[in-house]
Amino acid sequence: MEIASKYNPEEVESKWYNYWMEYGCFISVPDGRKPYTVVIPPPNVTGVLHMGHMLNNTIQDILVRRARMKGYNACWVPGTDHASIATEAKVVGRLAAQGISKQDLGREEFLRHAWDWTHEHGGIILEQLKRLGASCDWTRTAFTMDESRSESVIKVFVDLYNKGLIYRGIRVVNWDPKALTALSDEEVIYKETNGKLYYLRYFVENEPDKYIIVATTRPETIMGDTAVCVNPNDERYRWLRGKRVIVPTVGRAVPIIEDEYVDMEFGTGCLKVTPAHDVNDYMLGQKHRLESIDIFHDNGILNEHGGPYAGMDRFDVRKKIEQDLIDAGLMERVENYVNKVGYSERTDVPIEPKLSMQWFLQMESLAKPALDAVMNDEIKLHPAKFKNTYRHWMENVKDWCISRQLWWGHRIPAYYLPDGSIVVAETAEKAVELARKQTGSDSLTVEDLRQDSDSLDTWFSSWLWPISVFGDVMDPENEELDYYYPTSDLVTAPDILFFWVARMIMAGYEYRGKKPFDNVYLTGIVRDGQGRKMSKSLGNSPDPIMLMEKYGADGVRMGLMMAAPAGNDVLFDESLSEQGRNFCNKIWNAFRLVKGWQQAETSTQPEASALAVKWFGYRLDEVKTELDDLFSKYRLSEALTLVYKLFWDDFSSWYLEMVKPAYGQPMDAKTYGSTIGFFDQLLRLLHPFMPFITEELWHALEPRHDGETIMLCLLPDAHETDRDFLQAFDRTREIIAAIRNIRTGKNIPFKEKLTLEAGNEHDASFDAVIIKMGNLEAINRVEEKTSGSTSFLIGTLEYAIPMGALIDVGEEIKKLSDELAYQEKFLASVMKKLGNESFVAKAPQAVIELEQKKKSDAEARIATLRDSLNQLQSTK
């Protein structure tokens, strides 16, 4: 296979991805091997790739590819989420552009349009993931609303209802007045908003000269007030016990109640209680048995309880009521105030806490095993710092509002009988059977039943994802589930640790009796160089496809991972992708160099090459062991950095230079064979991170059969390494680096041969390497160094290079004198610090030891400099 002069990512990537697909390299079927299973966090079906997806799926692909190369039966299940609110909003928007409303169409016709939209846009993000190199088993692609997943969702709803865990009731929910649906907490984005704090006068009933002042940010909700609450420990309001106050503009008398929930320091210490429009007020209302008055229509317009403001929008009412309160003498004052207001993530309008009839799932009993599993490390979070966050959520779990006022989604399988009673069943036909038994009326038909119009929260399907992707959740004899479940690793973001991860754990224990995954790798947020979260609105998020076109998928993958420690935010800059591309070029050029060498079968292996081969073999084994350790701790960024340095520094900068034959000369076959073997191992270690270039070069190493691929090669095993040899070789590299520094500092060209003088303590084992890499004439053992030499220290051993006519003696004396003056000044500062009794008494022992080491190092350097100066001065 001929290797091109330049690396062309676009050509290489398309060629090898098509090859992997053609030969079914990603496909997994149950067999005798141990499975390694990952399920993709399903992106929105209508979404497109963004940098968060890039990070998440790069990490998954690294883990999956490495597992394959460890001999596991790796199965990465892809799929998409039907994303009820997002998709419905898109379809409603497209219809509105044609002058068509959702209501005009009716449910069935609207759903036809929604399916058309899904089929039209649904495959985009999955195709984009292929550009990234995602090695998913595409034959297993799942969709949360396909037939199999839908059947499982409905069966689970019915099962939980029959267990008494699902119920219908009135609660305060996050309401989107534009989408006209309840929202889950994670669909609410809190934004800092410049608003006002209104101080209102609530006059005491039958005491017209007395009033209390209540602070609120939402005066438009006072029509729903049913109490004013104070803290029982607040001495200021003891006189109000048992009294009632008049709600401003409304004229309704409401009781004063006492509860320690009230913060005495906020505002005036008096809280207006509006149970229908604040979740905390609702809890107070339940506790104190207060009336709940809902003053809003679903669209944010005030209803008949809004009094004179009925028919007005909530924000128009806020402006109008402010002036009305001032005119009535009921406004004490108004202050500017910054607070966090919840906005719908999908429609970007302020949400309305609203009392609403919804379906709920009781969570307390489901949460217990899910909490225990994480706290006892049956399921491990990486990094573990998120355990406390998880525990807080799970110990304070609330019932889950699972209904949405949407048409796109899994329709709730609840059916209303003519008398208003409810039956829950998987199908209308089964519902009729239940209804007949329940009522004793055999004349009931499907037409007599009315199915609930709400759909289930999208998360109600995705919480089953690790189970449902392998078939029927409720099937106890599901062979695929028995083999692939529990899955191995889940890669996701911390912001959905509760909303998705915790719920999957609950579902796993409820429906399989075991955890859904072993480990949860929590990624950070991708931010720009200024630390800002990447977003379309800020214009700071690069297009991943354009990045891959510019730098190649491997380059972008590497750039992301170099800056992606688990659980910490990723400060991404395009220069990281450039660094990744440069590394690809480095690998490519190193390969071309090696393959360009000629072999001589009969030549003897040089001593320097034999030492280099031995050293790099040990170094390679050392890195393999470190890699296994880093992967076991999910420190993937550090793992990549380790392999990067191994290739760039150890292999390219040192090993290849040590074994490189003289210009025009062939390389001995033994060294060449070892070098090709090392390259093969390096490509395997790099493959999980950089799949495309490694596949290309692996095929260029030697002829391959059709269907062969590096991804199905086993990773090389780590063998025992010789640490003493490696440490000795590190000292050898230090000697070579010092010789190079002297050449650079004194402008001595590399072609000029030098002589190195060493003491008797010098280990001569690696002299062949030092002579070659330093271009030395010889290494001589001496009792005293030659006059006019330049010396250097490696540890405590001194080395010298006779300069002779190679340098300007006067210039060298000046340079060494300046360095000596600096070192003497530095030593004086260290001695002053160590002579300070207060410092020595208070400083930690480690700090004192560091200063003492600085002292001894400076003293050794000064002695060497003085000796060198004496030698030079004696030659003048």
From Swiss-Prot:
It comes from the Bacteria. SUPFAM superfamilies: Anticodon-binding domain of a subclass of class I aminoacyl-tRNA synthetases, Nucleotidylyl transferase, tRNA-binding arm, ValRS/IleRS/LeuRS editing domain. It catalyses: tRNA(Val) + L-valine + ATP = L-valyl-tRNA(Val) + AMP + diphosphate. Keywords: Aminoacyl-tRNA synthetase, ATP-binding, Coiled coil, Cytoplasm, Ligase, Nucleotide-binding, Protein biosynthesis. ATP binds at residue 536. It is found in: Cytoplasm. Its EC number is 6.1.1.9. Belongs to the class-I aminoacyl-tRNA synthetase family. ValS type 1 subfamily. This is Valine--tRNA ligase. It comes from Porphyromonas gingivalis (strain ATCC BAA-308 / W83).
